[in-house]
Amino acid sequence: MKGLLTLAWFLACSVPAVPGGLLELKSMIEKVTGKNAFKNYGFYGCYCGWGGRGTPKDGTDWCCQMHDRCYGQLEEKDCAIRTQSYDYRYTNGLVICEHDSFCPMRLCACDRKLVYCLRRNLWTYNPLYQYYPNFLC
């Protein structure tokens, strides 16, 4: 069910004007990890993609759980995590967030923390978890 909802949500947002930081996150994941964000991480394990529950399957999935928690903290501060966009640069392997206001800067920081974690955990990536059914979590 998680996979179908995520796919429906992604397709609905795939019109030319995709709101928020989703394009930034996709771009950041692909630049830092070299992997296709949607294909490789959109449905991975128990936490990558929208929502999450249970125990993370590996280091890669743990990164996504940490990212969910980071976003949860921003929601508690009334940041619009699904619609807020932000600017960043990727230079010499570093992600540099470029905002002065709280929500865009913190959203970018959550995403930066995720992509660095995913890069550190590339060795844990297991294709068996790429389209993992949520009911097994």
Curated annotation (Swiss-Prot):
Gene3D superfamilies: Phospholipase A2 domain. Expressed in peritoneal macrophages (at protein level). Expressed in heart, skeletal muscle and white adipose tissue. It holds the Pfam family Phospholip_A2_1. PROSITE patterns: PA2_ASP, PA2_HIS. Its main location: secreted. Its EC number is 3.1.1.4. Disruption phenotype: Mutant mice show increased high-fat diet induced obesity, increased visceral fat depositions and exacerbated INS resistance. In a model of systemic candidiasis, mutant mice are deficient in clearing C.albicans in kidney, liver and spleen, resulting in increased mortality. In K/BxN serum transfer arthritis model, a well-described mouse model of inflammatory arthritis, mutant mice develop severe autoantibody-driven arthritic response characterized by increased leukocytic tissue infiltration, pannus formation and bone and cartilage destruction. Pathway: Lipid metabolism; phospholipid metabolism; Lipid metabolism; leukotriene B4 biosynthesis; Lipid metabolism; leukotriene C4 biosynthesis. Keywords: Calcium, Cell membrane, Cytoplasmic vesicle, Disulfide bond, Endosome, Fatty acid metabolism, Golgi apparatus, Hydrolase, Lipid degradation, Lipid metabolism, Membrane, Metal-binding, Phagocytosis, Phospholipid degradation, Phospholipid metabolism, Secreted, Signal. The keyword Cytoplasm does not apply. The keyword Methyltransferase does not apply. GO terms for cellular component: cell surface; early phagosome; extracellular region; Golgi apparatus; phagolysosome; plasma membrane; recycling endosome. The active site is at 67, 111. It catalyses: a 1,2-diacyl-sn-glycero-3-phosphocholine + H2O = a 1-acyl-sn-glycero-3-phosphocholine + a fatty acid + H(+); 1-hexadecanoyl-2-(9Z-octadecenoyl)-sn-glycero-3-phosphocholine + H2O = 1-hexadecanoyl-sn-glycero-3-phosphocholine + (9Z)-octadecenoate + H(+); 1-hexadecanoyl-2-(5Z,8Z,11Z,14Z-eicosatetraenoyl)-sn-glycero-3-phosphocholine + H2O = 1-hexadecanoyl-sn-glycero-3-phosphocholine + (5Z,8Z,11Z,14Z)-eicosatetraenoate + H(+); 1-hexadecanoyl-2-(9Z,12Z-octadecadienoyl)-sn-glycero-3-phosphoethanolamine + H2O = 1-hexadecanoyl-sn-glycero-3-phosphoethanolamine + (9Z,12Z)-octadecadienoate + H(+). Secretory calcium-dependent phospholipase A2 that primarily targets extracellular phospholipids. Hydrolyzes the ester bond of the fatty acyl group attached at sn-2 position of phospholipids (phospholipase A2 activity), preferentially releasing fatty acyl groups with a low degree of unsaturation such as oleoyl (C18:1) and linoleoyl (C18:2) groups. Hydrolyzes low-density lipoprotein (LDL) phospholipids releasing unsaturated fatty acids that drive macrophage polarization toward an M2 phenotype. May act in an autocrine and paracrine manner. This is Phospholipase A2 group V. It comes from Mus musculus.
